[in-house]
């Protein structure tokens, strides 16, 4: 006997209230999607039942003929969407209809707080789903029972979408879910068989499940003799779109299938459809979304493709077909060579899976290469949404590292913009004849990278430098050491080596070294453990000092990232480099007062650290020393 309450009134969580408001006020111009969303939910429920019934056939309850029924009642102004899928328990009803998935709650709040996203963007990211019912209905009733539970464990959910919902236990002899929409006064257009059929054909023709409606039969010659009989007929094609030849599928059909499997509100950016025949037979239909999902950076979150075996649904989120750096890809894999009862554990060590995965990766990379070459505007949209994720690729996929590297885009000193639109091929095409390295700098922000004093000699020599400021960039350059025979070189690590491009500067520096030997010793004595070394440099033209790190040590930027993530590591000390031609350095060189010299040494080091992006450990002392030097000048 259940101890659950028979009836209770509960409040939606705050995020659901916001989403309901957005749905009701932002989707009115496209209100017919409510039927697409509810049919999609029913289809998912049938897929889940099929999968769970593979290991427990009793869940079918002697009814394995899965369908979706659509009906309407003009007199009572209702539309009913009913299925015999998996159904829901009381707890699942509360979780699925009363809350946004826990993984999305925080992101939803942040987007609302920032107010950067348009309403359609919010809805696109979090999915309209069940809540779309309130576009056309002012009251929604859901009756459901989970497969395998007793008839008296049915649940009825009811809400007007304003802030609360009621739950009560009911008797429900059949498993599955029934959604009853009580339409608003202005929505009579949907109380029409032809209108509903047109929507089903437009949005849900591809649904594998039969969608059934009552058929209207007529008898006699006159309209007055028409007789309605409740005979049923299937109103969708109910076939697997992906098994059809590509030339038989319209773009709109591809788009609607994407919206169904990805639960997305927007059209996909691009897709690729492929059938492999021979020793291994499988079909893939892979999509690149137009917009990044809210949980893109959650590497532990749900991802992957829908897996079918011989057109029978097996599982959602089969992550084994795509590497982590392509986790944004949505789509379908339909294999003829896998067993129907394959488990997630078996997927991990299956040779067929590995071959299909290699094929999927190859096709997505080819699709991206085609976009990059032939549709630069669309590729720019892709890069803005998913570029940072693709940058994980060289570290994770050695076999395709060169192909991925060719798809990468960066900001650079060639363009006065933070837009990442420079490829490594572009960079190489503009290299100086004597240049043999690809130079880059990684900083906390684009502005910090662009204004770094380390760029001064490169600007003087008109040598392009890639400006990197994504958190993933340090990870990228640690695994992408060269491209087309050109090594990647950080300008923030090691000694500057421009080869033949810096002959004159090297000669000048050698002249200064003996004259500045005593000054360097004084700097080392005053700064002590704050630095690893101090030396003269020719990389500066306008700034008095800069800091760099040894070639084999972590950069300052990488160290800051590790500190932010709570990592424990041995911090590298910076190397202070001074510009022997700068007036400030010449003034300090001639400073005879030891106290003032010490202040100057601290000031010049702290200036360099600030320019590098470092946070000063004692900013108050820095300001005090600066003020004292200003008063003395």
UniProtKB/Swiss-Prot annotation:
PROSITE patterns xref list: HSP90
Region (C): 561-633
The entry's keywords: ATP-binding, Chaperone, Cytoplasm, Nucleotide-binding, Stress response
A single GO molecular function term of this UniProt record: ATP hydrolysis activity
Spans through the membrane: none
Region (B): 345-560
GO cellular component annotations of the record: cytoplasm
Signal peptide as annotated in the record: none
Listed SMART domains: HATPase_c
Region (A): 1-344
Source organism superkingdom: Bacteria
NCBIfam families per UniProt: PRK05218.1
Subunit-structure text: Homodimer.
Family the entry assigns: Belongs to the heat shock protein 90 family.
Protein name listed in UniProt: Chaperone protein HtpG
Organism taxonomic ancestry: Bacteria, Pseudomonadati, Pseudomonadota, Gammaproteobacteria, Legionellales
